[in-house]
Each structure stands twice: as structure tokens, then as C-alpha cells.
């Protein structure tokens, strides 16, 4: 096992022609984040002292999307093979460190597998990640003599007997910095593709009498690459199945694991139940006995014990105290807070608003830039009119206020505790004390009026 410091090279220069996209291939999303970010995250599990990202097509898009100052950006102006890509990064290799080579379009690689690779790398030699495939077509074959790895032959350069070999090269390897620089300087492009293959360093190492040790990944799918959208969609389902399995084994009840997407991280308590077609994004924390209904989307939110989220609700950057209920068809936008026992019903939207303990907004309301006290009833059709075309203003509603249906509150405005607002009222000024507030005109009846008739 190598105990030397380590740096990483991630190859991410490919255009991804078969994606039929203007976006660089490695920026296409898997589980809500770019494929290459998954690889960076895995590399960082090994405490790499430097992560070199070799880029080419769409470099500015990459730099903008990743926005990571700790990355060392290495330009590969021409894509002349994996060996050529590593040659561009070689000036950054320290002689006394190990270099781990990864790929930006192999997103399921894990820190666990990479530590396994570290464990087998011999001093002065190469650690190589390989897998056995029933159908190895298209992959470089591992050449062994007396059981020891001596080389890799690419598909287009292989003889018929070599094509029958089932052990293939994943492209992921670990080698010493000084050795790797020396081997890279000896690469040629004398092959069917006219490219510089990184795989040729295996034969060079063997010629020097260096030991090459191969190891398999924890899961074969970790080394699957993405060249088209079908492969990306396939790996998405592989990833989601793995996440669902982990959650089920940790006590979360997923009603249908095949219809659940985790695009981030999920912390959870005991006896959490999640129905079908739920999407979790960013970092979400669910307390004990939380129930999430079908079709909900929850992002970067904390939902405390005993909350019930009914179907088709969308919750983003929100905080829910215990015993709250939301939905169905509710939307909690960033900055929404529900105190203990609060209820937000169907077709209610909140944004930068706090609903106090035991307060209820049952249906068909918009509550934006609002501070609402405890035990408040928000009637159907209530709107906090918070925007004048330029500025956002705040509405403050005290404890025990009853807001009748079809009420508009023109912010900035405050309503004192205990006020009752009659249905159909427009609140334009502060209400300073408890009582009934209303501003509608007397009801009129025109008995002679006749409804218009359609012409026949």
C-alpha cells in the first residue's frame, strides 16, 4: 500500500458529440449535479493535495458551473488521446507523490473503490482498476503473463485471441509522479487511432521490471462511462437504486423505491414514510414520523417530527416545526417558516413568511414577506400585496387574528392581535387595536336588471 501524498488528474476535455448538446459532456447532470462533480467529490474523500482538471471543449462553461478555486485547470487544446491529456498535466506532478487518474464522465466511482486501489499499488509500480465483462467489446483488454499484468491492448489494435479476453481496463490507475512523467515522455502515437494512449505506460512499466497490481471496484457499475443520454439515464437509475437501498436499510419506508429520486443528501429520523414520485434535492432533514405524500418536491429544507406533507406540494429552503401539515398542492418558497402545529392547505403559496404556532392558511392564498402570529386563521383568497413594482414590503399580523376570505393586505401594514377582518376587506392602513374591520359598501339590488341573452 502506498502512503505517499497524492494528487488527482480528472480528464474532462471531451466534447461529447453523441450527447447532441451544446453543454460539455461532463456538465450533464446525474442526481442533480454535474457528472464531473461526482468524480471531484470522490477524489476529495482521499484528501488529495491537488485536483487537476484537464479541460478542452467548453472550458468557460466548466469554470462557471464548477466555480471551484481549489481546482487546478489544465488546458488540452487538442484532444489527442488520454496519454496526451496526462502529458498536459505532467508539469504539475511532484516526483514524491502518487498520481490518481480519473475520468469526468465516469460519475459513479466511489472513495471506497479508490481506497482499494491505493491499498494494492506497489512501491514503484502501478495500481490498476479492472473489471471482468461477459461482453468486453470496445474496451482495452488486460494482457497477463503467468498471472501478472504486462500490458493493455486496445480493441482496434487487438489480435483475435486477445479479443477473447474478458478482463478489461477501466482507465483508472495510480502511479508515482516521477515514474509517470518518465513513462509519459516515452509515449508514441503509433497505433490505429494515431493517438497517445495512457495504457501504453503499462508495457513501459513492465519493461522496467515494475510491478503492476490490478484490483476490481466494489461495484462494476462504478466504472461505467457516459457517452450518450441513454447511458446517462441508465446510470441515473443505478445511482437512485443504490440510494433507495441505503435509505430502506436505514429505516425509511419508500413505498416504491423505483419511483424515488434523491438529488442531494437526506437526513432522517425514525418511521419516516415517503410515497411515490417524491424528489429530494439539496440537503433535506426529516424528523421522526414525517410522512411525505406522492409527487412532492422538497429542497434544502428542515421538516421536524410528526409533520405531514400531502401530495404534490413543493417546499424549498423552508423550516417546519413539529406537527405541521402542508398541502396538497401547496408551495413553500425560500424563507418560509411554519411554527409548531401550523397548517398550510391546498393552493397556498408562502415566500419569506412565518406562520405562527397553531395558525392556519387553509386554501387559495398568497402570503409573501409576512410575519403572522399564533392562532391566526387566514381565509381563502387572502393576499398580502407585498410588491409595488419596485419595492417589497412587509405585512405583520398579530396573534389570534381572524382574516376573512378574499382579503387583501396592502403592505407595509400591520394588524394588531385579536382583530377580526371581514370577508372582502382591503386593509390599506394599520389596524391598531382589536375589533372588527371592514370597508365594503352597502349591498345593492337592481330588481329590473335582466341578464343578456344569446342571439339564436
From Swiss-Prot:
Q: Where in the cell is it found?
A: Cytoplasm
Coiled-coil-forming residues are: none
Sorted keywords for this record are: Acyltransferase, Cell shape, Cell wall biogenesis/degradation, Cytoplasm, Magnesium, Metal-binding, Multifunctional enzyme, Nucleotidyltransferase, Peptidoglycan synthesis, Repeat, Transferase
Q: Does the keyword Lipid metabolism apply?
A: no
Residues at which acetyl-CoA binds: 380, 386-387, 405, 423, 440
Q: Where does Mg(2+) bind?
A: 105, 227
| A Gene Ontology term for the protein's cellular component | cytoplasm
Query: Has UniProt tagged this entry with the keyword GTP-binding?
Result: no
E.C. number(s) listed in UniProt:
2.7.7.23, 2.3.1.157
One annotated GO molecular function is:
glucosamine-1-phosphate N-acetyltransferase activity
Per the Swiss-Prot or TrEMBL record, the active site comprises: 363 (proton acceptor)
Functional pathway:
Nucleotide-sugar biosynthesis; UDP-N-acetyl-alpha-D-glucosamine biosynthesis; N-acetyl-alpha-D-glucosamine 1-phosphate from alpha-D-glucosamine 6-phosphate (route II): step 2/2; Nucleotide-sugar biosynthesis; UDP-N-acetyl-alpha-D-glucosamine biosynthesis; UDP-N-acetyl-alpha-D-glucosamine from N-acetyl-alpha-D-glucosamine 1-phosphate: step 1/1; Bacterial outer membrane biogenesis; LPS lipid A biosynthesis
**Region annotated N-acetyltransferase, chain positions:** 251-456
Recorded hits in SUPFAM superfamilies, A to Z, give: Nucleotide-diphospho-sugar transferases, Trimeric LpxA-like enzymes
Per the UniProt record, one Pfam family is Hexapep
Free-text function comment from the UniProt entry: Catalyzes the last two sequential reactions in the de novo biosynthetic pathway for UDP-N-acetylglucosamine (UDP-GlcNAc). The C-terminal domain catalyzes the transfer of acetyl group from acetyl coenzyme A to glucosamine-1-phosphate (GlcN-1-P) to produce N-acetylglucosamine-1-phosphate (GlcNAc-1-P), which is converted into UDP-GlcNAc by the transfer of uridine 5-monophosphate (from uridine 5-triphosphate), a reaction catalyzed by the N-terminal domain.
Describe the protein's quaternary organization and the partners it interacts with: Homotrimer.
Q: Which family does it belong to?
A: In the N-terminal section; belongs to the N-acetylglucosamine-1-phosphate uridyltransferase family. In the C-terminal section; belongs to the transferase hexapeptide repeat family.
Protein name (Swiss-Prot/TrEMBL): Bifunctional protein GlmU
Instruction: Give me the gene this protein comes from.
Output: glmU
Amino acid at each position: 500500500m502506498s502512503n505517499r501524498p497524492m494528487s488527482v488528474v480528472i480528464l474532462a476535455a471531451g466534447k461529447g458529440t453523441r450527447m447532441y448538446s451544446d453543454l460539455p459532456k461532463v456538465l450533464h447532470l446525474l442526481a442533480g449535479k454535474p457528472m464531473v462533480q461526482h468524480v471531484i467529490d470522490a477524489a476529495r474523500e482521499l484528501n488529495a493535495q491537488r485536483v487537476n482538471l484537464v479541460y478542452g471543449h467548453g472550458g468557460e462553461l466548466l469554470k462557471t458551473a464548477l466555480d471551484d478555486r481549489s481546482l487546478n485547470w489544465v488546458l488540452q487544446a487538442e484532444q489527442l488521446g488520454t496519454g496526451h491529456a496526462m502529458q498536459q498535466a505532467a508539469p504539475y506532478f511532484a516526483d514524491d507523490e502518487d498520481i490518481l487518474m480519473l475520468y469526468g464522465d465516469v460519475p459513479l466511482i466511489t472513495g471506497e473503490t479508490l481506497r482499494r486501489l491505493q491499498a494494492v499499488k506497489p512501491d514503484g509500480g502501478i495500481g490498476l482498476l479492472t473489471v471482468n465483462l461477459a461482453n468486453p467489446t470496445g474496451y482495452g483488454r488486460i494482457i497477463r503473463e503467468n498471472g501478472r499484468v504486462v500490458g493493455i491492448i486496445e480493441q482496434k489494435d487487438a489480435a483475435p485471441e486477445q479479443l477473447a479476453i474478458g478482463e478489461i481496463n477501466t482507465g483508472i490507475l495510480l502511479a508515482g509522479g516521477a515514474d509517470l512523467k518518465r513513462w509519459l515522455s516515452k509515449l508514441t502515437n503509433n497505433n490505429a487511432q494515431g493517438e497517445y494512449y495512457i495504457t501504453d505506460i503499462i508495457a513501459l512499466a513492465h519493461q522496467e521490471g515494475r510491478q503492476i497490481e490490478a484490483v476490481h471496484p466494489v461495484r462494476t457499475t462504478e466504472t461505467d462511462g457516459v457517452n450518450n443520454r441513454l447511458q446517462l439515464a441508465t446510470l441515473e437509475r443505478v445511482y437512485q437504486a443504490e440510494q433507495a437501498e441505503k435509505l430502506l436499510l436505514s429505516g425509511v419506508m419508500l413505498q416504491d423505491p423505483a419511483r424515488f429520486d434523491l438529488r442531494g443528501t437526506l437526513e432522517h429520523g425514525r418511521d419516516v414514510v415517503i410515497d411515490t414520485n417524491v424528489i429530494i434535492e439539496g440537503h433535506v432533514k426529516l424528523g421522526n414520523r414525517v410522512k411525505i405524500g406522492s409527487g412532492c418536491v422538497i429542497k434544502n429544507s428542515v421538516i421536524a417530527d410528526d409533520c405531514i406533507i400531502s401530495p404534490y406540494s413543493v417546499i424549498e429552503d423552508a423550516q417546519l416545526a413539529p406537527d405541521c401539515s402542508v398541502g396538497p398542492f401547496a408551495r413553500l418558497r425560500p424563507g418560509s417558516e411554519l411554527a409548531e402545529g401550523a397548517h398550510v392547505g391546498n393552493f397556498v403559496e408562502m415566500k419569506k413568511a412565518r406562520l405562527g404556532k397553531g395558525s392556519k392558511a387553509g386554501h387559495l392564498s398568497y402570503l409573501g414577506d409576512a410575519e403572522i402570529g399564533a392562532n391566526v386563521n387566514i381565509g381563502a383568497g387572502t393576499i398580502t400585496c407585498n410588491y409595488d413594482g419596485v419595492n417589497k414590503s412587509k405585512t405583520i399580523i398579530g396573534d389570534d387574528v381572524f382574516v376573512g376570505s378574499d382579503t387583501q393586505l396592502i403592505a407595509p401594514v400591520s394588524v394588531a392581535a385579536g382583530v377580526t377582518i371581514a370577508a372582502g376587506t382591503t386593509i390599506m392602513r394599520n389596524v391598531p387595536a382589536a375589533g372588527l374591520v371592514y370597508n365594503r359598501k352597502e349591498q345593492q339590488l337592481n330588481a329590473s336588471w335582466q341578464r343578456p341573452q344569446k342571439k339564436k
